[in-house]
Amino acid sequence: GRPWEQIRLAVAYPKLNVKIVATHCGISVGEDGASHQALEDMALMRALPNMVVISPADAHETYAATLAIAEYDGPCYMRLGRSDVPVILPEDVSFTIGKASVLRSGKDVTLIGTGQMVDACLEAAKMLEGQGISAEVINMSTIKPLDSETVLGSVKRTRCCVTAEEHSIIGGLGSAVADLVASEDPVPVMMVGTRDTFGESGAPADLMKKYGLTADDIVKAAKDAVSKKPRRWWRR
């Protein structure tokens, strides 16, 4: 729309030192419905040259990311939701633009989450562990520039991955990871996110379940990814 065009021409094109913080992003906005649920914002901002795109995992990382983008000389977009998000990172967590963090090591599948889906990835990893699958969890708080080194290093070990985002799978984290992996080290990539759809009004937890954005959905995707690995990689 018109605001995006203004950001494109008046901020990204001249590479101005402007910081944009968006709230009420994702399906968990809840009762406000489709008109208020931004499910394509990361795709729109990621497509803009010069634009940094941030999606922090919790309150502590949001604070650290705010300090980091304030020091960065250039346009930045930071994405926040509306609903309460569990605190999963320490209060003194560090934040570097373009750097992901491995929250849990594993050898069978890589789970890459952003925003509040990082917590769901950690929960899914525990569930998978009980089923004999070792999952590595990556907090990808910077969508652009993507931390290609961390992603490729992880999938080199696990040989498959799942991305999880409270956003459309078109143009967001999943697309970014799939683009990278397809060109550098092709492995199965499964995406957890909304599917070419608008949202609707409802309780946040109910909407997360309906649109397939829960730990159970990540577990299912992880099993699917593992099943698609070449057999020589499974349980090496």
PLM regions with names:
Residues 1-110, 135, 226:
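Conserved thiamine diphosphate
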Residues 29-30, 79-236:
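Thiamine diphosphate
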